[in-house]
Design a protein with these regions (language model features):
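Bacterial N-terminal signal peptides
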Residues: 1-9
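Alpha-helical structural elements
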Residues: 2, 29, 33, 72, ...
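Acidic, serine/threonine-rich low-complexity disordered tracts
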Residues: 15-120, 162-268
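Active-site/ligand-binding surface loops and adjacent short beta/alpha elements
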Residues: 120-177
Length: 268
């Protein structure tokens, strides 16, 4: 039920690579919304909604791309496990490298706040963190040139040149996760046509994410993601088993997309 973790999971080690992407897939004005559903045995239940927006912002007199992701549990479930998550990232508009990141999470009565300031000139991050029943603490973390946060990495994956890979190839990157530098990878699985309720049939690029076993997810490459096979690379569907049951997310709204939706085969 930790909604944004469906999109921004804990991921495990791989090898690093040069982060030579150019952002062509997203632009200010884009807004994407998803329903997150949970399954135990044979029953699926909608438990919350996740939203992602892109806008322009100015930080330190420089133009930035402001990425914002939110996750909210539906009120009917708040008595059981209330979720109110917010992730913010201020990135370079072209490379998507982050310069500032904020995570404000409330899940089942437990609160986490994390704030990163990226010093790209010195390749360090100044971190300020706090958790429920734990006082605020600060840290300085050495990073690589190609380090991303858990929100900007989602947009990074939309700009990978998948035509340069064969099915089964892995694509490594580096993220800063809970104040630790972690190498991660995605596995390109090829192309597949899928239907999405309310939107029709699409040609998609499919890949998996290698997950760390933890409080929510099982370890392994069982999380699968389908994105549109066009210049928007919009995530349409995500499936993943968790420790008890499984979760899935499907798109319910897309607005302000940068390119024509050329991957749509039909509207039915």
């Amino acid at each position: 039920m930790i909604l944004l973790q469906v999109f921004l999971p804990e991921i495990t080690s791989g090898q690093n690579e040069k982060c030579n992407i150019i952002n062509f897939a997203s632009a200010p004005g884009e807004s994407l919304s998803y329903i997150v559903s949970y399954n135990v045995f044979i029953f699926w239940t909608d438990v919350g909604v996740v939203n992602f927006t892109v806008s322009e912002a100015e930080k330190d007199k420089l133009k930035r791309l402001y990425l914002h992701g939110t996750g909210l549990s539906f009120p009917i479930w708040n008595w059981f496990f209330k979720v109110k998550d917010s992730y913010e990232s201020w990135t370079d508009p072209v490379t998507l490298k982050p310069y500032e990141f904020k995570r404000d999470v409330y899940e089942g009565g437990y609160k986490i706040d994390i704030h990163y300031i990226f010093d790209r000139g010195r390749n360090i991050v100044c971190s300020t963190s706090s958790k429920t029943n734990k006082p605020e603490w600060k840290d300085t973390i050495k990073i690589t040139e190609c380090t991303y946060d858990v929100l900007s990495i989602l947009y990074y994956t939309r700009n990978i040149d998948y035509s340069a890979y064969n099915p089964g190839d892995t694509i490594p990157v580096t993220i800063l996760l809970d104040n630790e530098l972690t190498n991660i990878y995605f596995r390109y699985l090829g192309k597949e046509n899928i239907r999405v309720h309310g939107f029709g049939k699409f040609r998609c690029i499919k890949f998996s994410v290698y997950l760390v076993e933890g409080t929510l997810f099982e370890g392994g490459e069982d999380m699968e993601i389908w994105v549109t096979d066009d210049d928007n690379r919009i995530p349409l569907k995500i499936n993943s088993p968790i420790l008890v049951g499984s979760v899935k997310a499907r798109i319910i709204s897309m607005k302000g997309i940068k390119h024509r939706l050329n991957s749509r085969i039909s509207k039915k």
